[in-house]
Amino acid sequence: MQALLLVLVLFIVQIYLLPGNGISLESLAVDKRCKCVKVTNRPTGLGPIIAVDVIPPGIHCRRTEIIFALKKNRKVCVDPEAPWVQQFIKKLERQHRTRKENLMVGEDGGKSTVGPVKNTIEPTPPTIGSHICL
């Protein structure tokens, strides 16, 4: 009787773990929780920011998370609604647009006799869900 119960339990577990039954394999491989337990809304004392991670809301977390990577492998979660964070992200977007425009113009200022320089790889501006290295 116990062997039959064990076989039945194993069969049910196997059915639920098969792909296509509401469990995505991706969700099994990623952390299902928010990465930021606590956020700061103060810019003081952060130091140089090396990279920015913007993680959109999803099944793992209901809120947008912004993580700044600092020197010495420190990571700080910041409040996405804080005005200084929004200004910082806008500044990064402006810098990105400027770099993109400079790539399109070319090194000679667009005075090439061959023709306009075409950018074959179009960089995208930093958006939610992106990782930005500074």
Swiss-Prot record:
GO cellular component: extracellular region
Keyword annotations: Evasion of host immunity by viral interleukin-like protein, Host-virus interaction, Secreted, Signal, Viral immunoevasion
GO terms of biological process kind: defense response; immune response
Stored Pfam families: IL8
Cell compartments where the protein resides: Secreted
Molecular functions (GO terms): chemokine activity
SMART domains per UniProt: SCY (SM00199)
InterPro entries the UniProt entry points to: Chemokine_b/g/d (IPR039809), Chemokine_CXC (IPR001089), Chemokine_IL8-like_dom (IPR001811), CXC_Chemokine_domain (IPR033899), Interleukin_8-like_sf (IPR036048)
Signal sequence interval, chain numbering: 1-22
CDD domains: Chemokine_CXC
UniProt main location, coarse: secreted
Family according to the record: Belongs to the intercrine alpha (chemokine CxC) family.
Function as written in the Swiss-Prot or TrEMBL entry: Plays a role in the early phase of cytolytic infections presumably by recruiting host B or T-lymphocytes.
Subunit record text: Homodimer.
PANTHER family per the UniProt record, alphabetical: PLATELET BASIC PROTEIN (PTHR12015:SF198), SMALL INDUCIBLE CYTOKINE A (PTHR12015)
Protein name as catalogued: Viral interleukin-8 homolog
Organism: Gallid herpesvirus 2 (strain Chicken/Md5/ATCC VR-987) (GaHV-2)
Gene name tied to this protein: MDV078
